[in-house]
Regions:
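N-terminal secretory signal peptides that target proteins for export/translocation
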Residues: 1-12
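Ala/Thr-enriched low-complexity intrinsically disordered regions
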Residues: 3, 17-18
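Solvent-exposed residues in well-ordered beta-strands and their adjoining turns
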Residues: 24, 87, 278-280
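A short glycine-rich, aromatic-capped structural motif
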Residues: 39-114, 134-135, 209
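Functional-site microenvironments in short loops/helix caps that host divalent-cation chemistry
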Residues: 47, 53, 57-68, 111-262, ...
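Short, structured beta-strand segments at or near domain termini in extracellular proteins/domains
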Residues: 270-281
């Protein structure tokens, strides 16, 4: 279960048509749009072309989800394990921060703010924390405004696991304290540089903790997956990775593998969900 941070989604009214029109204007006059330093070359990581292992064939033989009252079994929506070839691409080294998102809002003049910001300002001393409580649409718009996109599931997973398909950035076994996740984590967002050991084989940071991340893709079965899952379809978008949690089954070690897959309505927003961007150039 995701950590919700709002009482009613309907309190936050969206007007994406006007927003996209605004962004279209900004794209047409790029000379007048200052670029955040988040988009300097050294802030994105080149993931080289090549094969990687995606998904898993693992099965939870103990039915852990039933013991804790969860609906979805572990791992099954990530079957089957397979090798995939991807061309090279770039991905943000860090999650998009409050300060970076604030700059985007100033440039776009979009007035729909993250729910926990007060008077248009992010919480004090949290400029370098990942921005949260943004919908998929807002995350997508941010990336688009900078000539990028949200990473696909494939891009996200390759960046997280490397060519060897590791379950954790540092290796095969979960090690407490290496990422902001679980009962020993901070149970709140932390600066994107706070956990230097949460570094993927490509040195992409924070993919296994701090916040879960929106991806570009709909929640669909992988090729070859025959599971009958009623939530599959073009209704929910995919969240990847783990984030801080305050309670619940996410404290269990079985739920901590770094490439975990979750689904959410693209109109919803959460206190432990953020995003990063990717690019082919």
């Amino acid at each position: 279960m995701l950590a919700w941070s709002f009482s009613q989604v309907s309190n936050k009214i969206k007007n994406y048509t006007a927003f996209i029109l605004c962004l279209s204007f900004l794209w047409g006059c790029c000379d007048c749009v200052p670029q955040s330093k988040a988009y300097e070359a050294d802030q994105m990581i080149l993931v080289p072309a090549g094969e990687f292992i995606m998904g898993t064939n693992k099965i939870d033989t103990e039915d852990t989800h039933k013991k804790i009252g969860a609906v979805k079994p572990l791992y099954l929506d990530q079957h089957p394990e397979r090798k995939i070839f991807l061309d090279e691409y770039y991905i943000d080294q860090y999650e998009v921060t409050n300060a970076e998102y604030s700059h985007f809002l100033e440039v776009s003049q979009f007035t729909d703010l993250p729910a926990h910001w007060q008077d248009g300002v992010f919480p004090k001393e949290q400029g370098d924390h990942p921005v949260t409580q943004v919908t998929w649409w807002e995350a997508w718009s941010y990336c688009q405004s900078n000539g990028k996109q949200l990473p696909t599931e494939e891009q996200w997973e390759k960046a997280a696991r490397g060519p060897a398909g590791l379950p954790f950035p540092w290796g095969e076994k979960y090690i407490k304290g290496k990422a902001n996740v679980g009962i020993e984590g901070d149970r709140k967002t932390m600066p994107v540089t706070a956990y230097p050991e949460d570094a993927s084989p490509y040195k992409v940071m924070g993919l296994s903790g701090n916040v879960m991340e929106w991806t570009l893709d709909w929640y669909l079965p992988y090729p070859g997956n025959t599971r009958k899952e009623f939530r599959f379809g073009k209704v929910f978008k995919v969240l990847r990775g783990n984030g801080f949690q305050k309670a619940g089954h996410y404290f269990l070690e079985a739920y901590r593998y770094s490439f975990s897959r979750t689904e959410a309505n693209p109109n919803d927003f959460f206190e432990n969900v953020g995003f990063r961007c990717s690019s082919k150039y």
